[in-house]
Amino acid sequence: MNTSKASKKRKAVTRDVEEEAGVFSGDELNTGNLDGALSDNAHDLSSDEDESDSEVELIDDFSDEEDEEEEDVLDSDEIPSDGEDSAKKKSNAAPGELGAVIDDDDDDDDESPSEEEQLNYRIEKDANGNDRFVYDEINPDDNSDYSDVDENANTIGNIPLSFYDQYPHIGYDINGKKIMRPAKGEALDALLDSIEIPKGWTGLTDPSTGKPLELSQEELELLRKVQMNEIPEDGYNPYEPIVEWFTSQQEIMPLSAAPEPKRRFVPSKHEAKRVMKIVKAIREGRILPFKPPTEEDEEDDTIVKYDLWADEAERKDHPMHIPAPKLPPPGYEESYHPPPEYLPSRKERKTWEEADPEDRDREFLPNDFGSLRRVPGYENFVKEKFERCLDLYLAPRVRRSKLNIDPESLLPKLPSPEELKPFPTACATVFRGHKGRVRTLAVDPSGLWLASGGDDGTVRVWELLTGRQLWSVKLSEEDPVNVVRWRPGKDALILAAAAGDDIFLAVPPIVDPAMEKASLDILDAGWGYAASVPPPTPAEANKKNNPPKWMRPSSSLADSGVCAVIPLRYVAKSLSWHRRGDYFVTVCPGSSTPASVAIAIHTLSKHLTQYPFRRRIKGGGPPQAAHFHPSKPILFVANQRSIRAYDLSRQLLVKILQPGARWISSFDIHPTSSTASGGDNLIVGSYDRRLLWHDLELSQRPYKTLRYHRKAIRAVKFHPGGRYPLFADASDDGSLQIFHGSVTGDMLSNATIVPLKVLKGHKITGELGVLDVDWHPREPWCVSAGADGTCRLWM
């Protein structure tokens, strides 16, 4: 190069770059000028640099080897032709080599463009001969705002690669050239990659480029820190000293111990003034709580109002149209704060949860939320609305004609209890003297005396009205007196009592001598008949079920008034007299009692005992009680679950009653049965708290079942004689219940049963209450025996 060109501005820059095509600003390189700049005029550059404020800057010393490498790298295609404009000349240095920009100043320096005004594109001809602008790749330097060009980066944008599945390319670069799809390795390459895993290998594919996704060194370091439970951020200290912006110590004493000012307890005067102003304005009408809309607001043309039903013509309902039934209104159990009695217990909740959804009585359980803001969303809301919709359009509808019947007219016309008086209402006399429970009692046919027996083994006779004890006898030291009954009839006064395995017949010395002598004559008449009976043969004597022989009592019992003893060998719990007073029946309900001797009929005039049943009564367990019919030769025998009627004259089974009770405790026959007043009626008490009324002509099932007691019913009794249509029952809940039960002779009408009164006075002792009850023969009075050791007269 000539020395005259030493005054030209030259700039040489050397730096280490990656093996990429560099992009430099400035004039295009000329081959001749480049050779001269690198070889001949090296000293000129340094001299010019020192002498003047030239823009040529030499950063590094260049060797001849670098010049030769740079010349070799230059390609012929990168050298512009002579026809191109010198202002647009541009060449790219080889990657990794020297990048130099030399501004050649011609003689006319003003005509050369500045470095900022130089163009970053070149013009080429496309296939149609039109001009086409080609932009060079940007290769930023250290001072540039651009980042390094990533040759693996995809410039197609945020477009899914699935759009290019059917094409060999995956997008286009900035110049519109296709970016070809990267080649995929075969099975052998995949095997080699799995054996020699490069650093940063993930086994994933980058969705934007289609190439294997590799992690950088920074990302690997971040993953290592996370795996080792280290802090990912550099320079972060998790153990910095605590700065207590607020104290962690609980302060007990106040910050200020000054007394509270009075203004905090006195209403504010300023607020009172403001409130009074508002009140005055409301009274004067200057402030209205509701301001009605004016006519201008109502006639506002900008507001368009639509009437959806303006063109809808009124249509009559179909003749067969049936409106949908309304849902029942919600009850107390659906409240968010229901009363406590509507909330289920734990047992009820568990039973409801364990039951099948179809077997549940309701779809939800009542809950108490306390306040409305705590009520959550109803989980079955959508289900209920869906089922309601199904019912509306799937369930058939039927018109049901309502019967205009007064419900009161359907109920039986029962008289008022006030109209059915007299009946016992209060306790008049209390009989005290027994030690332990009083198990049984009976009122004599005259209505003057009361006999009772209890656990102390004694039988006591009381004066009914005064409660004074007149006579007492000790029948047993160990066994209680289970039952006492007076012989019917007023011609004699004979008392039968069952204690232990024996039956005792006594004449209490409480009457006049004539009555006492008549009673003793009736008892003594049987001894002569018993002596005239021939003794049993040896074969009959060896039988186990031979009837017992009547015996005379011991001297001590005879002095007390006992006249005869019947050894039954089993405990009798029931004793009932025939209406004529010559027969009485006993029942031994023990499980160890043989069936053939459980029921015995005794003849008073002959001192004879007979066993009418050879076998156990079928069905229902052992017998519990037995009574004679008041007017017919019929014996009623009750076992645990049924009652059988036997005709003694014909020795036939007449009828079987099925009360439906689990265990019958007692029963009684109406005193006017089989007379002009009506048919056979009887009442049954059971240990399962039921009181049953049976009409034998109506059915073998009970006519009425009354459940008014909370515990077992021990005894039931009709008023004797039929003068008063009353009957009573005694229960272990400590109460007696008085009923009105009238029977008419009209076969088309049924018996009328009306509850009258509940009598309470006995104390419950040992889970036992009232054990026996009996009526006065002429008055509407009743007497009860309790487990508390007392007897009570109710009138």
From Swiss-Prot:
Residues 122-133, 344-365 have a biased composition (Basic and acidic residues). One of its GO terms (biological process) is maturation of LSU-rRNA from tricistronic rRNA transcript (SSU-rRNA, 5.8S rRNA, LSU-rRNA). Residues 325-342 have a biased composition (Pro residues). Its main location: nucleus. Keywords: Nucleus, Repeat, Ribosome biogenesis, rRNA processing, WD repeat. WD repeats lie at residues 433-472, 476-516, 618-656, 659-704, 708-749, 765-795. Residues 1-12 have a biased composition (Basic residues). One of its GO terms (cellular component) is preribosome, large subunit precursor. It is found in: Nucleus, Nucleolus; Nucleus, Nucleoplasm. PROSITE patterns: WD_REPEATS_1, WD_REPEATS_2, WD_REPEATS_REGION. Signal peptide: none annotated. It comes from the Eukaryota. Residues 1-133, 319-365 are annotated as: Disordered. Pfam families: BOP1NT, WD40. Component of the NOP7 complex, which is required for maturation of the 25S and 5.8S ribosomal RNAs and formation of the 60S ribosome. Component of the NOP7 complex, composed of erb1, nop7 and ytm1. The complex is held together by erb1, which interacts with nop7 via its N-terminal domain and with ytm1 via a high-affinity interaction between the seven-bladed beta-propeller domains of the 2 proteins. The NOP7 complex associates with the 66S pre-ribosome. This is Ribosome biogenesis protein erb1. It comes from Aspergillus fumigatus (strain ATCC MYA-4609 / CBS 101355 / FGSC A1100 / Af293) (Neosartorya fumigata). The gene is erb1.
